[in-house]
């Protein structure tokens, strides 16, 4: 399995670097809601392409929050990933 993961990610290095650069260049200061929301929309596109079930939690004064889940019908403990 470890080798499979290595091949999977190694084969996508250019794509991952491109996406990381795009997201960083979007400039989304925490205090500027519309820029954070624009970033949330872009990240949501990527998550949807990966098969995530999503809920966007609207916020009035700060950027919206994405809650993304995969395989919720499968057994096993969930994994929590928080990003800022």
What is each of the regions a protein language model found here?
Residues 2-84:
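Acidic/His- and Gly-rich active-site-bordering loop/insert found
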